[in-house]
């Protein structure tokens, strides 16, 4: 970030926010390439990209020269006779420019966030990026709340909504026109946003740009929570957003209070409960409150109206589910979570009188949902739809050890992620499916029976599926036979993404 600020110490940029000329600077594409190698969570496959000739500085210089010489920057894509900027090697040039454009549009947000963090002296904790860090928060807060709302964030039904979202931040009209060009180009070719899904699907060639657009859209959807939180609580609350791809946003709190305060002056009395907690991951969020059913219904009503009025889109009311925590389990981040009432009888004796008191204690429970996991395994061809293990097709040139290592790595990843489950019987079933699928795969390769193969390789195959979690539990509870390790939860604060089973190869 210090390096980026050094490039941008220009009075004209700070005063007029002219981002468009930066596309003609070579260092922008170097920054985009560096971010793709080091800063991207979703681009792990780009480790060897530095040896790719497409990323050489010579090609970037030729691209910038072509942009300088082009009379009309954007020409008709349908005109095959022209060989201008887009017509010649259109896909590659669009990809490189969109990567540089993604770095440029992040500049206003990044600089404002850095200055905000320096003023407030807010420390950065990398562990807060972990997905598992959400669940200790649930354990601490949800047991004291009454109602929970499952919310699917509405998707933009028109591309212009994404452009209008950035108009308040970016005042450079040519940059916004270029953004429209990229959106319409990829809408026609890749179907950037589909109405059947609740979140955006990003083109593999332009993940950074589309992830930035989706995060900006989600930030606008969540802006109402900042305002209502400030109005409903007597405590001063500060907020800032830190998103993936090192894309940072600084909350427009003051402007938001002025706008929404004029539009909703008579509804603020409905939000007096300070115990409201909001958590989001990707396109799904959880809103929990200690208030009454009436209050939580009002939250739903005003959220739907806010999204309809502010984004000019129809947000279906059935995308927000309201339930009581004690009677409902909600699915979030691969876990089926709920708050259970555990009754305990306590015997109290005072002098000659004895009393039996039955107390109910709320406890946060996390369960591994077996049906969705079996569905994922079936999709990846480890088992059929009913969970019966089948042989997985692999390349014939793979050795037995490579096949066993791949199965073992998938099993360890699942065990590592679902280590926070309070009931691990379902997880043991998943391990059994993977182990037997591995045995069927190897027996098919050697044209043998599963029984004969397991008898010959049983102990070695079993060792590959021992997880780090079981080793940690043996260290934590070595001499406590009363503890049941299969009920102990362990949250790892180094998990920042969910691995797709289908991409294990």
Curated annotation (Swiss-Prot):
Tell me one GO biological process term: RNA splicing
List, alphabetically, the InterPro entries matched. Domain_X, Maturase_MatK, Maturase_MatK_N
Q: Which GO terms describe its cellular component?
A: chloroplast
Chief site of localization: plastid
Q: Does the keyword Chloroplast apply?
A: yes
Source domain of life is Eukaryota
Q: Which GO terms describe its molecular function?
A: RNA binding
Q: Which HAMAP family match?
A: MatK (MF_01390)
* Entries under PANTHER family matching the protein: MATURASE K
Q: Which family does it belong to?
A: Belongs to the intron maturase 2 family. MatK subfamily.
Query: What's the stated role of this polypeptide?
Result: Usually encoded in the trnK tRNA gene intron. Probably assists in splicing its own and other chloroplast group II introns.
**The protein's name in its UniProt record:** Maturase K
Species source reads Calycanthus floridus var. glaucus
Per the UniProt record, the lineage of the source organism begins with: Eukaryota, Viridiplantae, Streptophyta, Embryophyta, Tracheophyta
Q: Which gene encodes it?
A: matK
